[in-house]
Amino acid sequence: MSTISTTTAPEFIRVKRRRDEDSVQALLIDEGKRVKKQKFIFKLSKTVSSESYQSEQESSTPLLKLAHEDHRHFVLEQRKKSRRDSDDEKSQQRLAAEGSTVDDDGLPPEINQMVNDYLKLNKGVEKTERKKPSRKYFTGDSAKIASLPSLDYVFDIYHLEKIHDDEVARYNNEKNIGFVKIIEHIDLALDEESDPNEARSDDEDSNDENYYQNDYPEDEDDDRSILFGSEGEDIAALGEEIVIGVNKSRFSSWNDDKIQGSNGYHDVEEEYGDLFNRLGGKSDVLKSINSSNFIDLDGQEGEIEISDNEDDSDEGDDIEYPRNEFFPTDVDDPLAHHRDRIFHQLQKKINRS
């Protein structure tokens, strides 16, 4: 909301007061700043009651809100017409014009009068809508909104007129002068004709993979590049270098402890000489490992057959084997003999291996 100038002030205003109170002869427009010369003033035109309005213009005149108990400070709140209100007003004017020609179309005058009364009633209701009184346009005691008692009241009708320099002296008496502050409420609603999707082309598809708002990360496992952009990639690379460096330092320290000799030097030849000899002294480590791990499966099968034959021959022959007497009955017990024979065969296999 903003304070408007006198050029946009309404032509007529009205003030509600009790019948036994004195009226204010004129109202000066409070523009929030000192003005050397007042160019416009609201002069008291007449005083009427609510039942004796002579015209529709008087009944729809803006009503001032009392903002001080001395009945000399008022507030006029009016709403700026939006585009929709202007269109509605034009539509009503067009309908009214069409209604005025109904009689020419041959309709009865009673129906014509009913249509005109309906249009006037809707127009008057729309114009007489009022908002709640505001308390923030005056400071101090003036900020208190005074409510009138429910007694017999009248309306003072004021007319906006230009004031001349020679008429200023007539309104020097402060008791007969009041003040009105005109406040305009600006409708900040979004324009109906503006489309928020107007800037986007019809050829653009929001579901398209190449749409500018659809940004898919290349590496879903590493979210650092998404959060930090190119800096995140540099941080990730730096972290990998740090891990590699730590692993190298750990291996180096372990290697130094393992191969450092008593004389303080690295005895590499003594530590890994045996391993080098087993690999055949070859630079190709893989080939050396394969050649040193050659397994003769035929020879192993022959050894297994020989050992099995020896075991079978031992079981068939009456051989001597050491006896173990764990119990007094082991001397003549056949199970004890069989047990000692098995122990003897197992011991022979252990000795061969």
From Swiss-Prot:
Stated name of the protein: RNA polymerase II nuclear localization protein IWR1
Other comments on record: Present with 1080 molecules/cell in log phase SD medium.
Any one of the GO CC terms: cytoplasm
Organism: Saccharomyces cerevisiae (strain ATCC 204508 / S288c) (Baker's yeast)
Residue ranges with Basic and acidic residues bias: 77-92
Family membership noted in the UniProt record: Belongs to the IWR1/SLC7A6OS family.
Superkingdom, taxonomy of origin: Eukaryota
Keywords linked to the UniProt accession: Acetylation, Cytoplasm, Nucleus, Protein transport, Transport
